[in-house]
């Protein structure tokens, strides 16, 4: 039994973990870098009012990573005859806030410990939408690495290739002090929507 559990855990560490998301989202996916699969999730209770709906800073490195991820996605889409997604500053801020929230509170999910879904977070940020989707990832150190991982995953790729979206925003957060409860260093969120 322990050997089988260790083998299963090793397989999880060696591959990309994918989980779908429902609720009002059309699609959502999770991606964890190989070697960074979480053993457990800390669910710190905090008030919804404390949810970080905006970034504490516009660090140039963070902005550069987010812009590069959007460039990679739009270059890919245009090369396949799809529309380039409008890079929305409001979606970027919401995506970055979710990445920061995951890093600060040791969870990795589309749904926050407070029970907020991607659509809930966008509504709290006064972002209107007809349809919304989300990709998240953890452990990938560069925009190219997370883009490559998402492209290798059918669910993530489906979000990136969907002609249903008109706007997108990519958000990145760095956890400079990962712990056993929150072992990831790099957190990524990309929100997609149609208005």
PLM region spans:
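Short, surface-exposed glycine/acidic/tryptophan-bearing loops
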Residues: 33-36, 40, 92-141, 160-162
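Short, well-ordered surface patches within globular domains
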Residues: 61-119, 166-168, 173, 177
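Post-signal peptide N-terminal segment of mature Sec-exported envelope proteins
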Residues: 29-63
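Short, conserved catalytic or interaction motifs in soluble domains
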Residues: 23
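Bacterial N-terminal signal peptides that target proteins for export
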Residues: 1-10
